[in-house]
């Protein structure tokens, strides 16, 4: 660590690796609320946050655990569940009178088609206006969970590995090969609740 009279200690959140202030300033200068998306090992979190000089105000938070309420039996950290979280977040924002926002992915690397952008796609489909590039969004097949269903079909030849990989799906009574159909059912439940 540097020493001496000219050494300047960085802000605490910068030292802890939590905030990139240059990026935060650009988001705040837009004057729009931020759709903050955070990903954990088994869950997705989406928040609508407004700037306040005393500290950011969280308008609402949608955690992927809320998908249980709609009958979601799949994993809560994958692409289809991320899309559904984004869909709910988009409808909640519109319900509270917010028509536009900017996406805040924090310190995550921007990778084309990942779960963070699945949340963005869900919010866009709900009707929220968020500046984005179409090339960054995941494909419809991946959003529906086709890649998971195809992997399950391929893995079914090895029964032991299949049961180990998809144990939560099987415990919940969901055939992983039927995930795209299950996704559509849950999506329709969400849409019908908000319309």
UniProtKB/Swiss-Prot annotation:
Entry GO MF terms: 5S rRNA binding; structural constituent of ribosome
UniProt xrefs under CDD domains: Ribosomal_L18_L5e (cd00432)
Coiled coil, from the record: none
This protein's UniProt keywords: Ribonucleoprotein, Ribosomal protein, RNA-binding, rRNA-binding
Record-level GO cellular component terms: cytosolic large ribosomal subunit
Gene Ontology process terms (BP): ribosomal large subunit assembly; translation
InterPro entries: Rbsml_uL18_euk
Keyword Cell membrane part of the UniProt annotation: no
PANTHER family membership: LARGE RIBOSOMAL SUBUNIT PROTEIN UL18 (PTHR23410:SF12), RIBOSOMAL PROTEIN L5-RELATED (PTHR23410)
Function noted in UniProt: This is one of the proteins that bind and probably mediate the attachment of the 5S RNA into the large ribosomal subunit, where it forms part of the central protuberance.
Subunit text: Part of the 50S ribosomal subunit. Contacts the 5S and 23S rRNAs.
HAMAP family linked: Ribosomal_uL18_A (MF_01337_A)
Family per record: Belongs to the universal ribosomal protein uL18 family.
Protein name: Large ribosomal subunit protein uL18
Organism: Nanoarchaeum equitans (strain Kin4-M)
Organism classification: Archaea, Nanobdellota, Candidatus Nanoarchaeia, Nanoarchaeales, Nanoarchaeaceae
């Amino acid at each position: 660590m540097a020493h001496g009279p000219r050494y300047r200690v960085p802000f605490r959140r910068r030292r802890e690796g939590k905030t990139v202030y240059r990026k935060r300033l650009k988001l705040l200068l837009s004057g729009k609320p931020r759709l903050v998306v955070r990903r954990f090992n088994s869950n997705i979190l989406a928040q609508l946050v407004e700037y306040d000089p005393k500290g950011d105000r969280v308008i609402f938070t949608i955690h992927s655990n809320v998908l249980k309420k709609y009958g979601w039996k799949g994993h809560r950290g994958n692409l289809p569940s991320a899309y559904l979280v984004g869909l709910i977040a988009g409808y909640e924002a519109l319900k509270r009178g917010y028509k536009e926002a900017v996406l805040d992915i924090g310190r995550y690397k921007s990778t084309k088609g990942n779960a963070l952008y699945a949340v963005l796609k869900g919010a866009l489909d709900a009707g929220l206006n968020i500046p984005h590039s179409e090339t960054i969004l995941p494909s419809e097949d991946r959003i529906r969970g086709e890649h998971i269903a195809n992997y399950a079909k391929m893995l079914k030849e090895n029964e032991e590995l299949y049961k180990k990989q998809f144990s939560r799906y099987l415990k919940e009574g969901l055939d992983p090969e039927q995930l795209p159909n299950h996704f559509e059912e849950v999506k329709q439940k969400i849409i019908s609740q908000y319309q």
